[in-house]
Swiss-Prot record:
Subunit structure: Homodimer.
Role, per record: Catalyzes the synthesis of cyclic-di-GMP (c-di-GMP) via the condensation of 2 GTP molecules. Involved in the control of the switch from cell motility to adhesion via regulation of cellular levels of c-di-GMP. Part of a signaling cascade that regulates curli biosynthesis. The cascade is composed of two c-di-GMP control modules, in which c-di-GMP controlled by the DgcE/PdeH pair (module I) regulates the activity of the DgcM/PdeR pair (module II), which in turn regulates activity of the transcription factor MlrA and expression of the master biofilm regulator csgD.
Residues that coordinate or bind Mg(2+): 720, 763
Record's subcellular location: Cell inner membrane
Keywords: Cell inner membrane, Cell membrane, GTP-binding, Magnesium, Membrane, Metal-binding, Nucleotide-binding, Repeat, Transferase, Transmembrane, Transmembrane helix
Protein name: Probable diguanylate cyclase DgcE
BP GO terms, sorted: regulation of single-species biofilm formation on inanimate substrate
Organism: Escherichia coli (strain K12)
Amino acid sequence: MSKQSQHVLIALPHPLLHLVSLGLVSFIFTLFSLELSQFGTQLAPLWFPTSIMMVAFYRHAGRMWPGIALSCSLGNIAASILLFSTSSLNMTWTTINIVEAVVGAVLLRKLLPWYNPLQNLADWLRLALGSAIVPPLLGGVLVVLLTPGDDPLRAFLIWVLSESIGALALVPLGLLFKPHYLLRHRNPRLLFESLLTLAITLTLSWLSMLYLPWPFTFIIVLLMWSAVRLPRMEAFLIFLTTVMMVSLMMAADPSLLATPRTYLMSHMPWLPFLLILLPANIMTMVMYAFRAERKHISESETHFRNAMEYSAIGMALVGTEGQWLQTNKALCQFLGYSQEELRGLTFQQLTWPEDLNKDLQQVEKLISGEINTYSMEKRYYNRNGDVVWALLAVSLVRHTDGTPLYFIAQIEDINELKRTEQVNQQLMERITLANEAGGIGIWEWELKPNIFSWDKRMFELYEIPPHIKPNWQVWYECVLPEDRQHAEKVIRDSLQSRSPFKLEFRITVKDGIRHIRALANRVLNKEGEVERLLGINMDMTEVKQLNEALFQEKERLHITLDSIGEAVVCIDMAMKITFMNPVAEKMSGWTQEEALGVPLLTVLHITFGDNGPLMENIYSADTSRSAIEQDVVLHCRSGGSYDVHYSITPLSTLDGSNIGSVLVIQDVTESRKMLRQLSYSASHDALTHLANRASFEKQLRILLQTVNSTHQRHALVFIDLDRFKAVNDSAGHAAGDALLRELASLMLSMLRSSDVLARLGGDEFGLLLPDCNVESARFIATRIISAVNDYHFIWEGRVHRVGASAGITLIDDNNHQAAEVMSQADIACYASKNGGRGRVTVYEPQQAAAHSERAAMSLDEQWRMIKENQLMMLAHGVASPRIPEARNLWLISLKLWSCEGEIIDEQTFRRSFSDPALSHALDRRVFHEFFQQAAKAVASKGISISLPLSVAGLSSATLVNDLLEQLENSPLPPRLLHLIIPAEAILDHAESVQKLRLAGCRIVLSQVGRDLQIFNSLKANMADYLLLDGELCANVQGNLMDEMLITIIQGHAQRLGMKTIAGPVVLPLVMDTLSGIGVDLIYGEVIADAQPLDLLVNSSYFAIN
């Protein structure tokens, strides 16, 4: 029996109440059965109590069986006393009933699968054997032996038949019933069909018993119709109800079966032929559907065989014992055997002995369910006895009951790859020996997979044990903190400029500080991007010590030489120039001879901005800002200008006296140019080069702020393309992108210079028309819509047509709230699309009312969803992008069901709340269900769970206290409970957050994205994780702005000692990009599919956390 089948299906919180309910059910069915016994036999002709006990034993753990037997027996005895006298009680019969129930339950557990006991006809035959044949026969024998009577054969037959009929009528229903089956009848169609079928079956069965000959033949036809029409559960319920009604009619009037219906037979003598044909026709159609399904399965198997046979890599079906069941041509060519020869061998016989044990360990994990698939590099013997390398990928096919059937193996030839690796290794050994003789360490950095490779000398230089895997963090921690920023900048600049670099820095070693000189060159890929860096490290400590001695003798020379790549100007105490290097001469336009003795600000024409005021005091620059952010411009005397950043260093004598200063000026023109490009990317759509939503909303806010002062009227237009998705689906995304660019140019050509056109997302556009009335706005919008409707887009020789709809709202003194005008334009646009597309609609108040009626969810329905409807907790696995298999943290999202059965996600549901109490109530239910149903299992698995906590819940001291009380009373360690809190709420509710952290909970700040102002107030002890906004991560692999923002957030997180979480991540390329940035954790489909929390904790295996 599988582990799953060993779990107890039912575990009620009140067992005593459940036993009482069983006793009451047994009492009712016993009363019914005993009523039937009053028309002719001492034994009941139809007996249900034994079947009730049998089902109860089957569905409950063995420790509850005594209680079940006692409660059901008391129900039987009570029914007997109610109908008969106390003296008529026969405890022997009750004991026999218990023996039959125990035997039947044991047999059913052995013969049937646990989760779905009745899957096919074979299962039903095993059910009949275990409940309707063996137990009744055993009971009949015991009755004859223990209570002998005048006619033992009659007693035996009545007992066996009554028990068998009761078992076949009740046991299937009892085995199939599950509480969630009742939820299916929320579907009105299924409920109506079930009730109608029940009513028709009972009515026609009643009429058959009263007026038709051979009534049971008619009833058989009716029950077959019910079986074909309805699902199993409903069909077995109708069978039980029909049996009870017919038996009750027979008990009330035994003469029903003896009365011939001569009148009907005289008028319809051929009626039996109809009864012969109906079941045959029904079964013919059922078998036809079954054969069609078998044909479909056969076709699928044929497709699989063809795909396997003609695959370019080796594929095989392998038995659970290792025998080759089926192989394709590629595998046969790789191993040198024919298919017939491989069938006589096992993979163990062909595997290199050193790889066999590792392979078998993975096979055991696969069979036990610990893993779903595995891959490894392994060696095989081919027919000639040679060892060949292969990349093996294996998955397991299981039977519906979970039994392993066979393995699917993919075996790819990597022999040439291994030979190349061996050649490269030998070459590397020769290079290493040569460099060891010269004391030079060689390193390589592959950028995309982020892999570092060091030779032996590198480990010796950094005094790092050879078993430690080198990476950026290992190297970065070795660098002296004072040199880290400069080193990182040099490397980043080299990568951006795709040029070699030379870098000198210091590292910390056991004996103190070691000076390192690094030289590196880049290797470009086919696209011209840097693929990897190759470089050397040299120990320059002795040279540096000598240089330090020379620099101490002449500090001015030290500073000048150290800054030789930048403009260097020396001044005396009177601010007059005493030295200028060539770079300074070039940037200022003055030669050193001309500048000597001239005041500094006469030579250096520095302004704040390109056309800003002159700098009057060289010490007035904002040193708190970075080099790029300081908007300082140096104007050359001969023309031209430079964006610069400068620093001033005082010059001192040996006794500390100040003798002047050294001014170092850096040319940051390119850096500021990049910053401007990033600023442009942040405010413009990358595809159409129109303003994006953020820029559009900013322009709208500026326009709204001037309405009261200028008393002008403006127009806001929303434009939505029609049939764009059809072009995108039929011609491809490239065509869709080209169409958007062409339409953007078309619309832009029809606007004034002061108008603002923006792409809001997808196929939606926004248009701001300053100083424009409704009539003019309607005219402009109509022109645009007509132009779009008439536009012919040609792609790959085909003409595509799209349309557009527009909604207009007027902005004036009485209507200048951003959210309202955006909503009005959206509602007007919706009215245009709803009115037939290709239209222009001006907003009217009644449109908003109609839109609200369609979209709003009533408050009562929201409360009912929170309090009564089903709630599902979905778990999303979180792991490091560098080790995606290691998951020990799970983010929880919520799915709710509306009263119509529609699934609504948590964020959409919360956005519809008009009362903060709804968020508070939803939080309370989430925590209650988690601690009641999942906390114990989560604690036993040792995994960390992150639950959402809204701002309303966080602001409630009562809810926070209740949460901590539930946590204290549960077996869950507080460190395993993570709470997801919106980032903007952390400062306003710092006291509640600190209270949760002191209790041991971990805090996850969500919605961390484009607003970086929060980091000005965020402290290191406020939270543990930063959950990045999902939109920020979606296209990070192709969006430089998003990549820069995530890099900034990652830097802040490292500074604060927090970890970053990004997602959802769907593409491996996005995972690689986030890994390269240094993001700590990610979630999404590349890590694991989301699954219900109860399934996660009940069916998964975890390491000890």
